[in-house]
Design a protein with these regions (language model features):
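Catalytic domains of carbohydrate-active enzymes, especially glycoside hydrolases
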Residues: 57-83, 356
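The substrate-binding groove and active-site-proximal loops of carbohydrate-active enzymes
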Residues: 43-52, 90-104, 161-175, 229-240, ...
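Substrate-binding cleft of secreted/luminal carbohydrate-active enzymes
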Residues: 288-302, 320-383
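Boundary/entry segment of secreted carbohydrate-active catalytic domains
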Residues: 29-54, 264-266, 329
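Active-site-adjacent "subsite" loops/lids of carbohydrate-active enzymes
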Residues: 37-41, 49-52, 129-187
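Aromatic-lined substrate-binding rim segments of carbohydrate-active enzymes
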Residues: 79-127, 232-247, 251
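Aromatic- and acidic-residue-enriched segments that line the glycan-binding/catalytic groove
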Residues: 85-97, 130-159, 195-224
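Glycoside hydrolase catalytic-domain groove-lining segments
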Residues: 218-334
Length: 383
């Protein structure tokens, strides 16, 4: 890695220490086991969710999910510029090994142990991707590395929906995030890693001097002021696709059975707004699992996204890798899905040949006296 020459030796030492610390507690993940009945997954965030705050809460959550019928958990490990595991890269680059909330612990290791105990697969979720901060003017990452900032056409720090962005088109920034994801894949017995809808860049970005110069050199034209101009948009989306390809290639070099999971915004909106060409990712076989975020609060809205995906975007042969993201709850808007809608959504997935889904998020299962969990346990997730 260009930004961290001692990466290989450092991660070897780190992994050795980790294995000693948790000797006998990890069991090797069964990477090759296919999802014969589809993914029944759930995201475990650190925002509006207390699961990761203690070993006991982690153990209780894994028991609850296994009893409900889930087979995969996606725990957050990268959020607001900090990791939920002790990171050699973060210590070397930013002097902060782990999120301060978890000082003296390793929530990822604790969760893997408990998930193994009840037979759940673990795919760590890099929620923030190329985002540096939320409403903090770039946060500690860009305070220390201002050259990593993404820029809009006016030269300002790129912000969208209060999120501030690193420049995901910059090779050094790409090396950093890739390093974090491979660090987890090398050092923990996981089933894969997951990128979110922030393995992306808002289309308004890419106007930093380095990227504009690269565009001129490669394409012989100036970057247009219109961020949605087709050539400029697809050129930048291609750089994101190249990053996904590199991530896939280097993940498989660690272990060919490790899964690359991606959860992009719905195509084509994700392409136009966030440079996520998820159709190309699938066409080029760069992802093993795709969880487009079909976060709709009514059945017809969800159905339209599924129909568009199946009828216009993917082939029948590609459908096996798809498990859409389904919105169970949103604390900001006080939304909680009702059991009837959840069962209707899952039934439609199966009717259209979609074998599974990933639910956002864990706490939604516990709302209203575990109403959604009970509906799953007594219905489509019954053993």
């Amino acid at each position: 890695m260009r930004f961290f020459p001692s990466f290989q030796s450092a991660t070897r030492n780190f992994a050795s220490g980790l294995k000693q610390q948790f000797a006998g507690k990890f069991s090797a993940p069964n990477l090759a086991t296919p999802y014969n009945s589809g993914i029944r997954g759930v995201w475990i965030p650190s925002t509006d969710c207390k699961v990761l705050t203690s070993k006991q809460r982690i153990a209780d959550a894994m028991d609850f999910l296994a009893d409900t019928g889930f087979n995969t958990v996606f725990p957050v490990v990268w959020n607001r510029g900090f990791t939920a595991y002790p990171s050699q890269i973060m210590r070397e680059q930013f002097g902060t090994e782990i999120d301060a909330r978890y000082q003296g612990r390793d929530p990822l290791a604790e969760l893997i142990i408990e998930a193994n105990r009840v037979g759940l697969k673990v795919i760590p979720w890099f929620e923030y991707g190329f985002v540096s901060s939320y409403n903090l003017n770039g946060g500690h990452l860009l305070a220390q590395k201002p050259e990593w900032a993404a820029r809009d056409c006016n030269g300002n720090l790129l912000k969208k929906n209060k999120f501030e962005w690193m420049n995901s088109l910059d090779p050094e920034v790409q090396d950093f995030l890739l390093g974090l994801m491979l660090e987890v894949a090398r050092n923990y017995p996981v089933n894969g890693v997951q990128g979110d809808d922030r393995i992306a860049l808002p289309c308004e970005g890419g106007y930093d001097a380095k990227t504009v110069k690269r565009y001129l050199q490669e394409c012989g034209r100036e970057a247009p002021q219109n961020p949605r101009e087709q050539h400029w948009l697809h050129w930048r989306a291609g750089i994101i696709t190249e990053f996904v390809a590199r991530l896939h290639r280097e993940l498989k070099a660690i272990n060919p059975d490790l899964l690359l999971s991606m959860s992009p915004s719905p195509y084509e909106w994700g392409l136009v707004e966030y440079l996520q060409d998820s159709k190309s990712w699938v066409d080029k076989k760069l992802v093993d699992l795709l969880h487009p975020q079909f976060y709709r609060r009514d059945f017809n809205g969800y159905k339209q996204l599924v129909d568009r995906l199946i009828d216009r975007q993917l082939t029948c042969e590609q459908l096996h890798c798809v498990s859409p993201g389904v919105l169970l709850a949103n604390r900001g808007s006080n939304y909680s899905m009702n059991p009837e809608l959840l069962l209707q959504v899952i039934a439609y997935n199966r009717a259209r040949g979609i074998p599974g889904e990933v639910l956002f998020f864990y706490e939604g299962l516990r709302d209203n006296g575990n109403a959604l969990a009970e509906a799953l346990k007594n219905g489509p997730y019954a053993r």
